[in-house]
Amino acid sequence: MLVVIACVCAALSALLGLAPYLVGGAIALGICVFIICFVSTEASLYVLIFSMLLSPEFGMGALAGPSSTTGGRGVTIRTEDMLLVIMCFAWLTRMAVHKELGLVRQTPLNQPIAWYTLACVLATGMGLIFGHVEGMTGIFFVLKYIEYFVIFFLVSNNIHSRDQIRRFTIAMLVTTFIVSIVAMVQIPMGGRVSAPFEGDQGEPNTLGGYLLFTGAVAGGLLLSLKERRVRGLLRGLLMLSIVPFLATLSRGSYLGLPIVYISLIVLKRGNRFPMIATLIVLIALGTAAMPQTVKDRILYTF
């Protein structure tokens, strides 16, 4: 343990010598986040929610590849990735202090997550053996997949009431609103819009997937809640987010949209006719009013 601490101190000293202000500020911020996570895991989850797509990203040197996008098979690290690592260490430290806390709460998804993770590890390992996958790039991609499961376990282990769920959901929808506004500002510049603070080569698919996921949550709430004011806010958020969603020109996100809508129809209790009628109207209006760039993206591969 002393050897590990000595190596970490030596590495930090070397980094401070290269970029004292930048690295020093990052270390100080990391220590603050660690303290927040240790004292209150709920507060750290709010930090994580708001950092989603509202934090800068950076390439991992050679891992950034020819392009900073996933399509270029490069690996990019966002600030929330680093926050998640710090949160995990704080979580483990907190569990060591409070021995009554369990490592992972039992949920119906635990076993499927374990099998999926095993499949990712085995597939990447075979790719490394046969030379189809670059070593560090493949490892970092698998780690970023596992990161989502870590978030799931962090949240599930720290949910204790419906009020917490409500507060986390509100924070997520507020983040979606901010992300949508920032993305809409990019539309007049031309090209595909991407998440904020991603530099010259953003990841439109990431933004499209994020808006699709949060839109599904907002749509589900719209169908289940009765308060008029809340329903009006949810409708406004959905109408706002659809504009940058289309501007991402993400085919994968487009393919997911009808699946989400059909799922909402199936899950809706009571009369489903209004949703089916709305779907028909949206298809008719979308065919006529959809921007040509979106039509070309759907109809043509190149």
Residue ranges, per PLM feature:
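Membrane interfacial helix motifs at helix-loop boundaries and amphipathic/re-entrant anchors
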Residues: 130-133, 189-197, 298, 302
